Amino acid sequence: IRDRHYIKEYLDGLPELTKAYPEMTSVTAPIETWSDDFSMAIAGIPSMVNDFTGGSFMETHYHSQFDNDDFYDEAVYRLHHELFTLLILALDETAVVPLDFTPVLERILAGGSEITAKVEETQEQIAAITKKLIQVTEEAQEKAKQSYEETAAINTRYYALLAEGNMQEAEQLFAENREREKQLLVKFKQEQDHFVRIDWYGEVFFPHEILWKNIGLLQDSVNALEQSDVDKALEKIYQVDNNAYAFMFDEYVYRHFTDYVFNQPKDRLKWGYGRLLGHEDLYHVVKCLLKKRKEADTDYREELHYLKECYKKQTRRLCETLKAVSYTHLR
């Protein structure tokens, strides 16, 4: 959940660099949890890292016996040094940290629009709260856009003064904007605190995205069971939180690998502390459905009741989360 605007502008203005990748360079967000930079970002320090997860090197060589000098690539080495050295120089020539919050708000809008489009009449409360979220987000988006344009103008002026050798005026402009940068970094930290959550696979999402996904999966599982399609129901339940473990392990192992996530000291969980929204325990539903499938038993009344209660719980949590975003976090 990160700004890409400045980096894209930086890439567009680069001179000819060493050609190492046929696909050239692209910018992705958010930072993934495997990177140390994730911990820096959620602590309020804007950060970035080179992404190598999509290439064959990550799959076949990284952290293996092949990760050695024999596979050194001169072009890649040079490109990384050129690219990131120039980026450091570019950032050094800004008077204010170039943070643009409009991509965050665009993603909230997209999620809100999806929820509004799919909610049924029985979910009028969600629809009403989501419409409010969209309204507040659109207002915040306009302010964020204006703020970034002002920051960009300041940095353009600062760069010009440095290029002219007018150090006295450049230093004055830099000093005048310390409070602006301070407020931007405060906003960045708030963004990380309020919006950065992770699912049980370490993927980064907004809190309402995780809840909305669970609601959809639970609704699909209910619909499947009502049609006696136990295979489809199990397929959906498998994707809810950490319930994949219920299919593969006994209850002790399931609870161990679920509970230990929540029962760690805070100083051991810097990157993930408070980022999980919770866990919908469907262990007994899974085991009962697997048993009934084996025995050709199609009486799913107990499982349907439990799943519907879980659905209601996730819906209440979604309403609370959407309200928090609308009435607090975007103000």
Language-model regions: role of each:
Residues V96-L99, T116, E120, K145, ...:
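Residue-level signal for secondary-structure boundary elements
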Residues Q227-S228:
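Phosphate/adenylate-binding glycine loop and adjacent helical scaffold
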Residues I1, T328-H329:
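Conserved small/polar residues in nucleotide/adenosyl-binding loops
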